[in-house]
Amino acid sequence: MTGDVTAEDTAREAVATALEAGPLRVLVNCAGVATPGKLVGRDGPLSAEVLSRVLAINTVGTVSMMAQAAAAMKAQEPLGEDRGVIVNTASVAAYDGQIGQIAYSASKGAVVALTLPAARELASSQIRVVTIAPGLMETPMMAGLPEAAREALSTKTPHPARLGRPEDYALLVEQIVSNPFLNGEVIRLDGAVRLEPR
């Protein structure tokens, strides 16, 4: 299903659709946008509209999906030690934000910041919350860059010297779900990259 993660109806509908297939055991939140914008750019100050849009999708959308999924997970019987696992997606930009990433870094920093309190709140319901902070990954956002730019970015990752792949992300999700003691943590999935200021 497709939808606007900033709309609560979308979150409710997504959870209801998932429940038609059976209990909701895992939520992977990975919708996001990376709208560039400096605090003060060529066209003047960063607009509240741009900031609000990025925060609405990357942060509010994440929280909305978490809330709807957690409500469904709380109502179901545990499977092993868990009723469910919520995996959120932040970014290394939450830690190493570059010039021009004010809105994006703020939105992903908020996802990092809410991980522990959400895990603590949901612990009594046997629901775990873990966040992945990907580095330079092969994503639709990255696909919009020229090939030369993607190649240059791939050399910035120390090891392996490439862009992260969707399979790398999926493997970490699988590991998070299968490890019942992993909770309230943010895991960098970045090949040891640290973003430069520009």
Predicted stretch roles:
Residues A123, R128, L182-E185:
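Short, small/polar-rich loop/turn modules that mediate ligand/substrate recognition or access, typified
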Residues M66, S107, T115:
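Active-site helix of classical SDR
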Residues V54-A56, A148-D168:
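Catalytic Tyr-x(3-8)-Lys segment
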Residues R165-L189, R194:
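C-terminal substrate-recognition "lid" of short-chain dehydrogenase/reductases
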Residues T2-E13, A48:
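The beta1-alpha1 cofactor-binding region of Rossmann-like NAD(H)/NADP(H)-dependent oxidoreductases
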Residues R12, A34-S52, A71, A75-G80, ...:
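Conserved mid-core segment of classical short-chain dehydrogenase/reductases
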Residues S91:
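Residue(s) in the substrate-gating loop at a strand-loop-helix junction
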